[in-house]
């Protein structure tokens, strides 16, 4: 495969072989494995297993999200400016981020080294802080480098959707791996101790520390293998330092007017940048907050057995996995906006179901299918819309993805901290009031944020995505 050119200007369309598409799609697998644990199990591990306060657990998650949010636009800006002779700037940042994730993530889900029963909570939380910051820097570097490769590798809108859908399909596979491994480790733990099937609230405790530690080690081991496959199979083109490319048989006889570079400061003047940013942020809030609180909802509101913190998220992501394969034909038939709206309707149906049913029982599996399919649909479509926004301006694409992710990470962290601060049982793991608390949290993070996402979508229906023409002389 020849290296892709830098822009989507005149010339042959850039396409990828199946092997190249698959090798690209697995480049975010380590991040997805870690994110599955981070969002689904971090609060549960810190609050229910380690016994830290709900506010302390929320503070650590907020620290991670803010660190990620601050690093993301900086990495995006540097990735647009950087150069690397051997592998290209995006892959160089991807490699640096991967190393940071591998070295830091296992410590987050392990006991505090040197801490004892007399260690104050603030000291233990302080211990986890540096590992979380390093992990989030690495996660941000890997995410932005990987996302910003999409508009550089292919030019066709449908191929961008296909790459994004393949990427999300492996995101689902990663989460299936995490939840399947979690179920297996919990099952093996129960078999080893000959425990009876009792309520999850009674089972989760300090005895589960080895389960989460082993799960984290498994995550980084498997993720490292897939990161290696990405670097071996994905070729990033080296950027030319000159305007334009050498003429070939696809070059028009009369050259079009030169299109000025769209720099990071120019994006800040584009209304479409804020419209897509709001849609992306609300989409990520729905996906991440529902993933963060589903385990708490199952544990404390529905009082389901321990295995459900693995099986229900597994059902969600299996549903999302199968839905991701419908993205390309559905987008082609009804367009981006209607595809997103369809996914949003499914999520609102889930929110209504949760709000109206005090005890779902076996129906929780059906609700999980709805949530998984809806989240997959809106996430893939919002990423495709972001690629549409960037269009041929791939030289500043990493900044766009960085800015989008900054808003989503900080918003997620603040939302989690707000929820944790409102927790009605500050002095114990769960009192009677927290049963309804997590019930309404799940309703709000899907239905309430879903309404905000619908408003953002309406703005794109009224004012479609477009970049205003600028004077070519308007350069720094």
From Swiss-Prot:
A Pfam cross-reference name: MFS_2
| Topology of this chain in the membrane | Multi-pass membrane protein
Q: Per UniProt, which keywords does this protein have?
A: Acetylation, Amino-acid transport, Lysosome, Melanin biosynthesis, Membrane, Phosphoprotein, Transmembrane, Transmembrane helix, Transport
Membrane-spanning intervals of the chain: 26-46, 56-76, 95-115, 122-142, 168-188, 214-234, 285-305, 307-327, 344-364, 365-385, 399-419, 445-465
Q: Which residues carry this modification: Phosphothreonine?
A: 251
Q: Name the chemical reaction catalysed here.
A: L-cysteine(in) = L-cysteine(out)
**What PTM annotation applies here?**
Phosphorylation at Thr-251 by MTOR via mTORC1 pathway promotes cysteine transport in lysosomes, thereby regulating lysosomal cysteine and cystine storage and redox homeostasis.
GO terms (BP aspect)? carbohydrate transport; cysteine transmembrane transport; melanin biosynthetic process; negative regulation of melanin biosynthetic process; pigment metabolic process involved in pigmentation; regulation of melanin biosynthetic process
**Where, per the database record, does this protein carry N-acetylmethionine?**
1
Q: Protein biosynthesis as a keyword?
A: no
* Membrane topology, Lumenal segments: 47-55, 116-121, 189-213, 306, 420-444
| Gene Ontology molecular function terms on file | cysteine transmembrane transporter activity; symporter activity
* Cytoplasmic membrane side: 1-25, 77-94, 143-167, 235-284, 328-343, 386-398, 466-476
By its UniProt entry, which InterPro entries does this protein fall under? MFS_2, MFS_trans_sf
| Top-rank taxon, per record | Eukaryota
What is the consequence of disrupting this locus? Mice are darker and display a uniformly gray coat color, rather than the expected agouti coat color. Coat color change is caused by a lack of pheomelanin, resulting in white, rather than yellow, banding of hairs.
Question: Where found in the cell?
Answer: Melanosome membrane; Lysosome membrane
> Any one cellular component term from GO for this entry?
late endosome
Main function: Transporter that mediates the import of cysteine into melanosomes, thereby regulating skin/hair pigmentation. In melanosomes, cysteine import is required both for normal levels of cystine, the oxidized dimer of cysteine, and provide cysteine for the production of the cysteinyldopas used in pheomelanin synthesis, thereby regulating skin/hair pigmentation. Also catalyzes import of cysteine into lysosomes in non-pigmented cells, regulating lysosomal cystine and cysteine storage, which is essnetial for redox homeostasis.
| Homology family | Belongs to the major facilitator superfamily.
What name has this protein been given in UniProt? Major facilitator superfamily domain-containing protein 12
Q: Organism source for this protein?
A: Mus musculus
Underlying gene? Mfsd12
């Amino acid at each position: 495969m020849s290296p892709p050119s830098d822009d989507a200007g005149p010339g042959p369309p850039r396409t990828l072989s199946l092997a190249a598409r698959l090798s690209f799609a697995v480049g975010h697998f380590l991040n997805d494995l870690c994110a599955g644990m981070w969002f689904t199990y971090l609060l549960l591990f810190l609050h229910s297993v380690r016994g830290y306060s709900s506010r302390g657990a929320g503070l650590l998650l907020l620290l991670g999200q803010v660190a990620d949010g601050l690093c993301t636009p900086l990495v995006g800006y540097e990735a647009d400016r950087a150069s690397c002779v051997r592998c290209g700037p995006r892959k160089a940042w991807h490699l640096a981020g991967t190393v940071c994730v591998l070295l830091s993530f296992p410590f987050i889900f392990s006991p505090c080294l040197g801490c004892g029963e007399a260690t104050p909570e603030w000291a233990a939380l302080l211990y986890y802080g540096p590992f979380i910051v390093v992990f989030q820097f690495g996660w941000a570097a890997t995410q932005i480098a990987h996302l910003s490769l999409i508009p550089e590798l292919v030019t066709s809108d449908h191929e961008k959707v296909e790459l994004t859908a393949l990427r999300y399909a492996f995101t689902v596979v990663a989460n299936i791996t995490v939840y399947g491994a979690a179920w297996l480790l919990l099952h093996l733990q129960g078999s080893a101790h000959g425990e009876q099937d009792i309520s999850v609230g009674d089972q989760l405790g300090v005895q589960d520390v080895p389960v989460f530690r082993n799960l984290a080690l498994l995550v980084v081991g498997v993720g490292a293998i897939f990161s290696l496959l990405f670097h071996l199979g994905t070729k990033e083109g080296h950027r030319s330092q000159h305007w334009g490319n050498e003429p070939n048989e696809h070059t028009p006889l009369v050259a079009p007017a030169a299109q000025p570079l769209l720099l990071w400061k120019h994006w800040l003047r584009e209304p479409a940048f804020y419209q897509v940013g709001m849609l992306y942020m609300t989409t990520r809030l729905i996906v991440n907050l529902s993933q963060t609180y589903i385990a708490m909802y199952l544990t404390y509101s529905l009082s389901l057995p321990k295995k459900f913190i693995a099986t229900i998220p597994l059902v969600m992501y299996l549903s999302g996995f199968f839905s991701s394969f419908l993205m390309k034909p559905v987008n082609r038939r009804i367009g981006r906006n209607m595809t997103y709206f369809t996914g949003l309707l499914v999520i609102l149906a889930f929110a209504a179901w949760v709000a109206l049913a005090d005890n779902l029982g076996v129906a929780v599996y059906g609700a999980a299918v709805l949530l998984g399919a809806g989240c997959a649909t809106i996430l893939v479509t919002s990423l495709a819309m972001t690629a549409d926004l960037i269009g041929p301006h791939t030289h500043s694409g990493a900044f766009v993805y960085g800015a989008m992710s900054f808003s989503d990470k900080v918003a997620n962290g603040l939302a989690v901290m707000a929820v944790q601060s409102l927790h009605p049982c500050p002095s114990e793991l769960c009192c009677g009031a927290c049963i309804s608390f997590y019930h309404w949290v799940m309703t709000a993070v899907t239905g309430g944020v879903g309404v905000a996402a619908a408003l953002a979508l309406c703005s794109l229906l009224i004012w479609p995505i477009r970049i205003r023409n600028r004077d070519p002389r308007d350069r720094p």
